Amino acid sequence: PQPWWIEGEGFLHLFTKYTGVRELYWSRSPDGRQWSADRKLAGIEGHYQTSRQRGSRVVTAFNRHPEGYPDRRTDLYYLETTDLGESWQTADGAPIEPPLVEPHNAALVREFDAEGRLVYMKDIDLDAEGNPVILVVTSGDHRSGPAGAPRIWTIARWDGTSWRFGEVTRSTHNYDMGSLYIESADHWRIIAPTEPGPQHWGTGGEMALWVSDDGGDSWRLEREITRNSAFNHTYARRPVNAHPDFYAFWADGDPFEFSPSRLYFTNREGNAVWRLPEVMESVLEEPILEE
């Protein structure tokens, strides 16, 4: 579920229905209590999506699952709405009449299936000009281990006329999950577990901060946020309207066996990590600054 509050209008809720396959739907509400009927956005055999809201505009990007198998997830699509789902359009403004049911349609950003690449959705944001920027990891295999390499953190950016693509870095697992932060026209950040962790071929790794000073054209590793960890870290999520001192939130754990799993957060600079208490002794507890 991905609910978005549109000031003065209400909620637009983007979500998945498991109808035998994973299909995308939306509904809307003026107050979060009374909801419209569910309406299907896409049913091309199955999808996963990531979305974002700015003002009255809600943007979403998603892959497709050939024959309903998420292990074969591929291709990349984009749609947006400015009226709580009353109408939908592509990045170039072409109107779309949902639901999407055919793989080849105007919302298709790139046909990764033809390249033999799988697509794992990570995040979406809007640049300083309001153009969508999508973050994905592409892979050669759904299984963990070296067979899927290279696993490429990829930026797909609409430049006003066409989609442009660029590589950020490479990863060790398809489910390495991070977030994109577009702070100005030139300055972009990614916080993600891109560095190998103690469980090398497992989900996650060591958390890192990547920075671009040229609007996503090139990237550099600014800082390793975690080091020498006992367990892999992953699923760094960007809080809505993130405060500079609470810029990314994630968990750790051993992906191969049962283990403790703790919650962490970092600041905008990625130069400190706090761990939440595993046991709350009172209503309020201080987070623990990691050494």
For each predicted feature, which ranges?
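Extracellular, repeat-based ectodomains that mediate carbohydrate processing or recognition
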Residues: 1-291
